[in-house]
Amino acid sequence: MSQNNLSRKLTRRGFLKLGGGALAAAAGAYLVPQALAAANRVLQSARGAAAPLAANPLDARYHLMVTDGWVYLPPKPGGTGFHPDPWAPAPFNTYTFGFRDVTGLSDAAVRQEKGKVQLNSPVVYATEGGELRITLTNLGFAQRPDLTDGHTVHFHGFPNAIPAFDGVPELSVGVPFGRSYTYYYRLHDPGTYMYHCHFEDIEHVSMGMTGSIFVRPADNPKWAYKDAATAFDREFALLLGEVWTTERFNAAHIQEHDWSEYDPDYWTINGRVYPDTLEPNTDPLTVPARPELQYQPNSSLITCNAGEKVLLRWANLGFQRQAMKVDGLALTIVGKDAKYLGPTAAQPADRRYTTDSIDISPGESFDALFTAPAHSGVGAYDTYLFYNRKLAYLNNAGMPGYGGQMTEIRVYPGTLPPQPAPNF
């Protein structure tokens, strides 16, 4: 898209899609072309920032793509007209928006991934003291090419003083269809964060444009925070969400829905519902043993050896308050909203606490540690349930049996190899 296309006269809605609302407010109602030109200069500058960097082991770079596509949720018996969606290509049945990690792919390969969404969005890892760059490419939607919305990355919980990289389109820049933009962050505080699209955010968050960000302390990547007391052997990301299949159907079929009637019927961990939460990780670029889970790549199964310390990083980017519980294990809450709860020079009080359950509201994150107990000696592993104690959410669309936000913690007698990456 040329600069002339950006400067073309736009409707008010089209202008807001470029995230220029705040620019126009600053420049005045008669300076819309100048505001758009300024937005274009920011985009061009961001492309320059994506040039090769000097090697720094603390820096991280990601290339995320915006697209839509289809995923899988256990179908309602007999169907309801909304789910399974009759337009879904086999073996999928549910429409969604999302981000895909296309880091390292060529431009041609990136374009081939349009319409191949990921739910939840990729986990981003970074290090305190380093620089994080996330390049966002807006390829648009395959199922709904009429939706030419802009999109953004909002680093939820990050105290970003630079509006251009905050991802709130009214105050910064929305990434238009066919464009790329690079977000830049200098990281100072370890912890568990989230990210999501902040453009038409109610819809885009609900439709699946959500992910987790881990910032590790520079002192030791196997600590949760800058304290050896937060050391761990294994870590697992658990991002909570909800799916309202009426909304998903209407979005795919170009129908309107009333947000005051929000009534989700599936409750997810890492984009899946139980028992699919126990299935292994997949790769969106390859077809797994269960092909319907190809674009829901993140397992929620927690595995460890007896005596190991395990870090659970969980966050909620749904719209409902949840209450997650572990049966038979004590959790030590060491962090909340990317803030260490142990004593520090600035905050000498020790605010860590031990519990077996935690209430987590939308937009909150918690870091919890537990030490795996001794193995019972019976069977290959011992099982502990990790579930939402709001029992009404432990089903899939009201169907019989367990579903929703539940997974397992499996404790082995020492037979597991070291963890190669989170959630493995």
Can you say where each PLM-predicted feature lies in the sequence?
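Short helix/loop capping segments that flank catalytic or ligand/cofactor-binding pockets
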Residues: 72-75, 145, 163-164, 205-206, ...
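N-terminal, post-signal-peptide metal-ligating segments of extracellular/periplasmic oxidoreductases
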Residues: 2-165, 170-174, 258-310, 400-424
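Compositionally biased low-complexity segments at domain edges in trafficked proteins
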Residues: 227-252, 423-424
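Non-cytosolic beta-sheet module surface loops
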Residues: 136-138, 187, 314-316
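Active-site-proximal structural scaffolding
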Residues: 8, 21-25, 190, 206, ...
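Active/binding-pocket-proximal capping segment
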Residues: 318-320, 326-351, 385-392, 411
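Long, repeat-rich segments with strong aromatic
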Residues: 303-324
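Extracellular/periplasmic metallocenter environments
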Residues: 139-154, 158-162, 166-223, 349-424
